[in-house]
Amino acid sequence: MLSPKRTRFRKQHRGRMKGMSYRGSHICFGRYALQALEPSWITSRQIEAGRRAMTRYARRGGKIWVRIFPDKPVTIRPAETRMGSGKGSPEYWVSVVKPGRILYEMGGVSETVARAAIEIAASKMPIRTQFIIAG
């Protein structure tokens, strides 16, 4: 699972996701990509599940780039705890994804293989996505 090696602060505010992604919205490394169409938090488990599904489908051929990184800690309070007494402890990491953001890229394979592999990865995501081709 992906997570930062160290962070400046243990806990973060939730924040809000408004507007489009103004960075990371163009294909940089591969030829095919999976682009987000909705805003959401994507957990490190979901990112890893999508990556594994793509690599398993593509087998040896091709290369995969993961363009998002979970750098936001999500805290959860223990079960049956009364309100107050501070914020809960960090439980897992998420990546804040806005519409237009590239999630995965793929290269070195045919379009049919890439489309099928990326479609499998898209089914692991909690948001609507689209398959795009560079150029």
UniProtKB/Swiss-Prot annotation:
The lineage of its organism: Eukaryota, Viridiplantae, Streptophyta, Embryophyta, Tracheophyta. GO terms for cellular component: chloroplast; mitochondrial large ribosomal subunit. Part of the 50S ribosomal subunit. Keywords: Chloroplast, Plastid, Ribonucleoprotein, Ribosomal protein. It comes from Acorus calamus var. americanus. It is found in: Plastid, Chloroplast. SUPFAM superfamilies: Ribosomal protein L16p/L10e. GO terms for biological process: mitochondrial translation. This is Large ribosomal subunit protein uL16c. Belongs to the universal ribosomal protein uL16 family. It comes from the Eukaryota. One of its GO terms (molecular function) is structural constituent of ribosome. InterPro entries: Ribosomal_uL16, Ribosomal_uL16_bact-type, Ribosomal_uL16_CS, Ribosomal_uL16_dom, Ribosomal_uL16_sf.
